[in-house]
UniProtKB/Swiss-Prot annotation:
TM region positions: none
Gene Ontology terms: biological process: ribosomal small subunit assembly; translation
InterPro entries: Ribosomal_uS19 (IPR002222), Ribosomal_uS19_bac-type (IPR005732), Ribosomal_uS19_CS (IPR020934), Ribosomal_uS19_SF (IPR023575)
Protein name: Small ribosomal subunit protein uS19
Amino acid sequence: MSRSVKKGPYIQEVLLKRINEMNKNGEKKVLKTWSRSSTIFPQMIGHTIAVHDGRKHVPVYITEDMVGHKLGEFVLTRTYRGHDDKSEKSSRLR
C-alpha cells in the first residue's frame, strides 16, 4: 500500500539538509545513511548515497529514473546463492 497523497513523500530531514548544503557548495561526497525508507528527490540527482543493507553501506548513484522511488529499493538485503543443482543422491530417492 502506498503512502497517502495528503501526507506527501517521506525523507529524513537530516539527509535532505545535507544534500541541499552539498548542492549549494557544489560538493560531490558519498553520504552514508541508514534511512532506506527515504524517497528520492530531484535534488539528489548526481549524488552518491551509501545506503545500509544490514551489514555494510552500499553506494548508490542517483539518476533521473530513480526519482520517486525509495533508497532501499536499490540495495538488496539478502544474498541469493541460487538453488542447489540436482545431485545424484536426490535423484536416487525418487
